[in-house]
Amino acid sequence: DCYFRDMWLVVNSLATLIVTDSNPYADWQINAILTEFSLSLCMAAKNIKGFANGNYDRDAILSELVARKHMANAKAEIKAKRTKINDIPAIIAGEPSDKAFLYIHGKMGYKEEAYYFAQYACPQGYQVIAIDLPEHGDRKNSKEKLLPWMAAPEIKRTYELLSERYSSISVCAVSIGAWFSMLALQDKKIDKAMFISPIVDMEKLICTMMEWAGVTEEELAERIKIPTDFGETLNWNYLSWVRKNPYKWDKPTDIIYGGKDNMTPRETIEKFSKSCATTLTVMEKGEHWFHTPEQMKVLNRWMKANVQGCIYDN
């Protein structure tokens, strides 16, 4: 049926990426997808964003494949190497420089996304450094979990090591990666921040998800962890940590936000933008995950303009 025909299309597209781009993903996600496919079409699906939480979205899958193709092309044009920073898998892209961008991916992301950003940053004299967050990329089975009290200290230690090498450090971060970055770097010298669909009020987001799930604070406090139908697990300890660890962000920051973002309300991002030195760009047709050709075109122009220090005109 259509589902299985499209699954074959997905796998054939992945195989084409491997063949035509000198096997750029052989040591990470694509090999995992192909291996799982031999066991179960459905199991293979879970590693592609279009299958998030078991929902089949053909257009999203194809958009993800196109995005990976663009990343492969960008990687081919940029000098890059794999390394480890504080024993965390990392990449460094670009020629040697005294200024750097630290790239922090979001949930379901991976350090290799930085190649796409690097095609704009490296020509401006930056090196781009990216790490895998816990449970992502080359750390899928890490003992560390994607929790703020684990991820933020890792980012902070990465910054501290980079500060010994670079005289200027900026940060580009996506979604929850932006929140982790603000927690980690709020007291550090950051020359510039670029945030893509940032989570800026985690407490509000968790409370919103509790409303979606019909869960009260009393229930969550009693049960500690409650799985939801939309794929997230509500966690009382997480919410309590968030409330005990507020952050203050006052760095020069450029934000791009989708008008249809279902993770951060418009009033929340606007309030955050007014509270600090932030330039906010809104793509009205954009979503939390920028992935359609139209959305990517806007994101590309925004990246290029802001890396160059220009004012982006939407």
Residue ranges and their predicted role:
Residues C2-F37:
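Hydrophobic/aromatic-rich alpha-helical bundle segments in the mid-to-C-terminal region
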Residues L102-G106, Y257:
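The conserved beta1-alpha1 loop
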Residues K107-Q119, E267:
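The serine-hydrolase catalytic nucleophile loop
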Residues A121-K140:
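Conserved alpha/beta-hydrolase
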Residues H136-S163:
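Catalytic nucleophile-loop/oxyanion-hole region of alpha/beta-hydrolase
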Residues A173-S181:
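Gly/Ala-rich beta-loop-alpha elbow adjacent to hydrolase catalytic centers
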